[in-house]
A protein has these predicted regions:
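Alpha-helix-loop-beta-strand connector modules within alpha/beta enzyme cores
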Residues: 37-62, 109-116
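Active-site-proximal loop/turn and secondary-structure-junction residues that shape catalytic pockets
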Residues: 30-34, 64-68, 90-94, 127-129
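Conserved, mostly hydrophobic/aromatic
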Residues: 11, 18, 29, 86
Length: 131
């Protein structure tokens, strides 16, 4: 078995394991069953609903990072589900051989969306320049 959960069942199992060990907050990256990263709102909805059912009261933090090459609009899809929190990446950085773009207009748009929808940001700082 791979170390990263891909399927809905794997995601719920790993979330429940963390919850049972005392986790109150679970950060969620979503993939298709083959492991391909996705920001598909409906896939997030199904997984987040299943985790909430298995882990009553847990706070979920969906990732808005997605994958390199995704548009800001794609990356923001999970915020359309109005989670309590979501990630807000604090700057551009190298990600393997790719560049993970988080320029000022993108960061402002993400922050604005979160503010308008009462979503608390989890600030993600990948290097010292993001502080």
């Amino acid at each position: 078995m791979q170390a990263v959960p891909y399927t809905i069942e794997e995601m719920v199992r790993e979330a429940k394991s963390a919850f049972d060990a005392g986790a109150a907050i679970i950060h969620v990256h979503v993939r298709w069953d083959d492991g391909t990263p996705t920001q598909d709102k409906e896939r997030f909805r199904v997984i987040m609903d299943a985790i909430r059912e298995a882990c009553p009261g847990v706070i979920l933090i969906p990732s808005t990072g997605g994958a390199t090459g995704m548009t800001p609009e794609e990356r923001l899809q999970p915020t359309e589900l109005f989670p309590e929190m979501a990630t807000l990446d604090c700057g551009t950085c190298n990600f393997g051989d790719d560049i993970f773009v988080n320029d000022m207009p993108t960061m402002r748009a993400f922050g604005k969306r979160m503010l308008e929808n009462n979503i608390k940001p989890e600030y993600e700082c990948f290097e010292i320049g993001h502080l």
